[in-house]
UniProtKB/Swiss-Prot annotation:
Belongs to the universal ribosomal protein uS15 family. It is found in: Plastid, Chloroplast. SMART domains: Ribosomal_S15. The gene is rps15. GO terms for molecular function: structural constituent of ribosome. It comes from Olimarabidopsis pumila (Dwarf rocket). Keywords: Chloroplast, Plastid, Ribonucleoprotein, Ribosomal protein. This is Small ribosomal subunit protein uS15c.
């Protein structure tokens, strides 16, 4: 449901599904699914590892987007209700 809404939103903007925004959106959906799974299955260590890998990928994509286009980064963060990256 949510994914289809975002895909139609992206098609209106004429951006491909390989765009950074769509990748971050799909990683966020996977992260939310895995988080709810891990609340029930605390000792599922393979899922924990997968979650950490996806978090790292999303973090790298968000860092790239914040360097290249700060406005699109801010819009995406607000749309997905996720926190900003920590700067070193």
């Amino acid at each position: 449901m949510i994914k289809n809404a975002f895909i139609s939103f992206q098609e209106q903007k004429e951006e491909s599904r390989g765009s950074v925004e769509f990748q971050v959106f799909s990683f966020t959906n996977k992260i939310r699914r895995l988080t709810s799974h891990l609340e029930l299955h605390r000792k599922d260590y393979l899922s924990q590892r997968g979650l950490r890998k996806i978090l790292g990928k999303r973090q790298r994509l968000l860092a790239y987007l914040s360097k290249k286009n700060r406005v699109r980064y801010k819009e995406l963060i607000n749309q997905l209700n996720i926190r900003e990256l920590k700067t070193r």
